[in-house]
Swiss-Prot record:
One Pfam family linked to the record: Mt_ATP-synt_B
Protein name: ATP synthase subunit 4, mitochondrial
Origin superkingdom: Eukaryota
Family membership noted in the UniProt record: Belongs to the eukaryotic ATPase B chain family.
Transmembrane segments: 41-61, 66-86
Organelle transit peptide: 1-14
Lineage, uppermost ranks: Eukaryota, Fungi, Dikarya, Ascomycota, Saccharomycotina
Length: 217
């Protein structure tokens, strides 16, 4: 059993190892340059420069140098691994902004077109205003005529009321005068009838009228 476990661990270890060619290719890809020759030149120049600086004591390797180297390697790895993701995110963000700007532009264009359509509908506003003004003038004229007619009707009603009152007054005055005249005549007749001379005169006149009737017969 221990040997089987050791064999399994060894097989897993070898299966997880990266191919040296692939690793070398990834290192070359991380070095700036357009082709393999230029990248190799950059790498060789960097190595020779480092050896020269260290051998001539122009640069002394210390803890800070190690930390700086590790940090630089970390930055290179992060840039290598995170570069595509950041590029994809940046492309997506730019595309999103482009879509937002295009949508805003389309909305603004539609709003401008709608405004132009509304204005084009009002191209006959002058004629419409003139027609409305003419109608309003006719309406004012009709209202003035109606008001004048109403005033005339009111005046006629008031005049009729005054005339009716005057006629009623005259009728009442005439009736009083006739009543007074009748009462005066009746009173005079009654007074005359009570007078003996008047009675004698009436009797004599009546006898004469009868005699005339007999004479004609």
């Amino acid at each position: 059993m221990p040997f089987a476990r050791v064999g399994a661990l060894s097989a897993r270890h070898y299966s997880n190892q990266v191919d040296p060619k692939v690793k070398a290719t990834s290192i070359l890809d991380s070095i700036p340059g357009n082709n393999v020759l230029s990248k190799t030149g950059v790498l060789a120049t960097g190595v020779l420069g480092s050896i020269y600086a260290i051998s001539n004591e122009l640069y002394i390797v210390n803890d800070e140098s190690i930390v700086l180297g590790v940090f630089a390697a970390f930055v290179v790895v992060v840039a290598k691994l995170g570069g595509p993701g950041y590029t994809s995110w940046a492309d997506g963000y730019i595309e999103n902004m482009r879509n937002i700007l295009n949508t805003t532009r389309d909305k603004h264009t539609d709003a401008v077109k709608e405004r132009i359509g509304d204005v084009s509908k009002l191209k006959d506003v002058v004629k419409t205003t003139q027609d409305l003004f003419a109608v309003s003038k006719d309406t004012v004229k009709l209202e003035a005529e109606v008001f004048e007619t109403k005033q005339q009707v009111v005046l006629a009603a008031e005049a009729k009321s005054v005339l009716d009152s005057w006629v009623r007054y005259e009728n009442s005055v005439r009736q009083r005068e006739q009543k007074l005249l009748t009462e005066t005549v009746i009173s005079k007749i009654e007074k005359d009838l009570k007078d003996p001379k008047f009675q004698q005169k009436i009797l004599q006149q009546s006898v004469e009228d009868i005699e005339k009737l007999f004479a004609k017969a």
